[in-house]
Design a protein with these regions (language model features):
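Charged, heptad-repeat coiled-coil alpha-helices that serve as long linker/dimerization "arms"
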Residues: 1-90
């Protein structure tokens, strides 16, 4: 009986860890999307889009942010997949 208790405790601990990882990844995506929105709003300001140097810098940052979002989404998909796999096992 003690072995079963330990196993259940370990399963719950692992499940919490997987859930936390998934939640952190979602928060990361939300944060990056907010930053992207701010950059796009900044780019739409006349003094920014009318200045080729500023405009190019902001465009580069937007591209970087979009890449970060893609990477973060891949990490979230991995975390969500691991959680789903765990839930299917138990």
């Amino acid at each position: 009986a003690l072995g079963n208790y330990q196993q259940e405790k370990q399963k719950k601990s692992l499940k919490r860890k997987l859930e936390k990882e998934e939640e952190l990844r979602l928060q990361e995506i939300d944060r990056l999307e907010c930053e992207l929105k701010e950059l796009k709003e900044f780019l739409s300001k006349k003094d920014v889009y009318s200045d080729p140097v500023k405009s190019r810098e902001v465009q580069e940052r937007i591209t970087e942010k979009e890449n970060e979002i893609q990477e973060a989404t891949a990490r979230w998909e991995k975390a969500a997949g691991e959680l789903e796999e765990f839930q299917n096992l138990y």
